[in-house]
Amino acid sequence: MTKVVVCALYKFVSLPHFESIRAPLLAMMEQAEIKGTLLLASEGINGTVAGTQEAIEALLVWLNSQNGLDNIVHKLSFDDEMPFYRTKVKLKNEIVTMGVEGIDPLKVVGTYVKPQDWNALISDPDVILVDTRNDYEVQIGTFKNAVNPVTETFREFPEYVKQNLDPAKHKKVAMFCTGGIRCEKSTAYLKEQGFDEVYHLEGGILKYLEEVKAEESLWEGECFVFDNRVAVNHDLKKGQYDQCNACRMPITEVEKQSPAYVQGVSCPHCIDKISDEQRKRFVERERQVNLAKARNEAHIGSDVNQVIEARREKKEAQRRLAAEKNNAKKSQVL
């Protein structure tokens, strides 16, 4: 069986022309049958995609040929099945949303620590270790003795810092996240707030799991990932968690045995939080998902609106590509 290559990538770089990159990038991904989502902003590129090895290699070559997008930080893992349903390239204000203006990792950032040096750093009693990820990610796995800020989104992280960290008291701060991108901004933010010794795990948790042997590892549990695998274990293979299609929270097989769990409708995490109207909508969505699956029109997890959206985006990408080729021909004639 041919393995699907999953590629997580990002790069902070000044991209004043980022809007013009979207159409050719989307067209390239669709032609190579790459699925997943990439975000473009004036500060760079970020996302996770999947495809055949040849397709992912072609994407990296294409990106490397674009002005400013060479030498992109990327990490590869493998899966037996395609972990994404659609192909998207989105234009954003930030490639990772902290919501604080003026934070620029290109100007100031924390000290990068290689995975093989990470254990020694976080074993230092003078170092406070902070997990910059969201609470639902931390719950299924984190580093030994790491502090959980209990945030629901990355936007809440600056407030956590203001309320809980002090440059005069916390002399050494080490931080980590899934692939490294959130720490680019979190360490830049701490440096701007006057913290002196600020460190972050280069390549994030995924790089650590790839390079550090399990018997030497200080990682505990699994690592949440933003695709249909939900989580990966220390071997970077799909873990034991599933995901509630209603609230998107990771759930265990034990939780799926709960009366609160209804496929696509509710789980123990959200049963008391969703309204009757939401429940009706989720039931209908699940019905449409099953109908689409029976017609072989979409994978599980897609509803009719998403199928329509995917079709429209593909047609729009084809239209833009055709228009660009036509304009190029006219320019040659002139």
Swiss-Prot record:
Gene Ontology BP terms: tRNA modification
EC numbers for this chain: 1.14.-.-
Database matches in Pfam families: Rhodanese, UPF0176_N
Entry keywords, A to Z: Oxidoreductase, tRNA processing
Gene3D superfamilies according to UniProt: 3.30.70.100, Rhodanese-like domain (3.40.250.10)
Signal peptide stretch: none
Domain (Rhodanese) ranges: 123-217
PANTHER family documented for this protein: RHODANESE-LIKE DOMAIN-CONTAINING PROTEIN 7-RELATED, THIOSULFATE SULFURTRANSFERASE/RHODANESE-LIKE DOMAIN-CONTAINING PROTEIN 2
Function, in words: Catalyzes oxygen-dependent 5-hydroxyuridine (ho5U) modification at position 34 in tRNAs.
Family: Belongs to the TrhO family.
Name listed for the protein in its UniProt record: tRNA uridine(34) hydroxylase
Organism (species): Shewanella baltica (strain OS155 / ATCC BAA-1091)
